[in-house]
């Protein structure tokens, strides 16, 4: 949630826990299944509780509506056959119906205008395609090969798009190198607020399953989502995107190491990604 839509944000420390344990709420929601969050939920006083709590020394659902997500988290065989999106599951846990409500996000209009002016001068009327190359050190199985990013960027440029590499501090050196090899613009890495503003200049975003997926969704951008290790039903693209996966099912379900030794992200070729992008452009 945008900070300006939250009345009070408490740090997770002893004083905050003490205050929460001695407060009364109309509704308490905890979607986190980590032990510390569930123990706190059990101690908080509320007229209605949704999500997860702590009972008999273990995580437990506050209501039966939260059981489904708890079981899919415990058992991969249940998670693999799930056909509900994350958003649908979250709403159901809170005893509500998901009606394609949009994400909430705060956009710094001044920063957005700054970057929009820069991109308008560079793109010469072409559609801007943001290429998000990173996925963080935790999820190496989501990384796409550098040479694939270069090939995709060149293909996009040749077909009349204006590609732009995007990423955080961890991807900076890589994006500089990719930019030089592909002859494609890379604006640099910035704080989150600036990154959101920069992303808003894009017409289409190409990304793996990362924070960028959520940012692009919140900004209502068209999106090509490369997915291997997750159940594709979990993602809600609001009719604005396409999910691209490997030709054969991924065996590294929710894993950070590929069981076959070679990441199935390598099986997603640049031409397939381009074709998916072109279908929603």
Regions from the PLM with identified roles:
Residues 1-281:
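Catalytic machinery of carbohydrate-active enzymes
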């Amino acid at each position: 949630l945008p900070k300006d839509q939250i009345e009070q944000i408490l740090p997770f420390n002893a004083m905050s826990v003490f205050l929460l344990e001695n407060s009364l709420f109309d509704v308490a929601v905890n979607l986190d299944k980590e032990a510390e969050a569930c123990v706190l939920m059990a101690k908080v006083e509320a007229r209605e509780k949704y999500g997860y709590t702590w009972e008999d020394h273990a995580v437990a659902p506050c209501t039966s509506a939260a059981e489904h997500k708890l079981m899919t988290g415990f058992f991969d065989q249940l998670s693999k056959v799930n056909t509900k999106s994350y958003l649908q599951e979250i709403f159901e846990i809170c005893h509500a119906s998901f009606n394609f409500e949009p994400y909430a996000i705060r956009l710094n209009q001044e920063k957005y205008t700054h970057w929009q002016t820069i991109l308008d001068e560079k793109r010469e009327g072409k559609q801007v395609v943001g290429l998000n190359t990173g996925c963080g050190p935790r999820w190496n199985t989501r990384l796409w090969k550098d040479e694939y990013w270069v090939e995709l960027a060149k293909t996009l440029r040749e077909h009349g798009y204006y590609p732009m590499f995007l990423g955080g501090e961890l991807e900076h050196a890589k994006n500089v190198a990719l930019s030089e090899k592909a002859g494609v613009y890379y604006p640099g890495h910035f704080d989150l607020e600036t990154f959101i503003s920069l992303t808003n200049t894009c017409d289409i975003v190409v990304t793996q399953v990362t924070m960028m997926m959520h940012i692009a969704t919140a900004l209502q951008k068209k999106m090509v989502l490369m997915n291997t290790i997750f159940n594709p039903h979990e993602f809600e693209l609001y009719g604005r995107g396409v999910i691209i996966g490997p030709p054969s099912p991924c065996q590294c379900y929710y894993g950070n190491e590929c069981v076959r030794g070679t990441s199935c992200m390598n099986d997603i070729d640049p031409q397939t990604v381009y074709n998916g992008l072109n279908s929603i452009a």
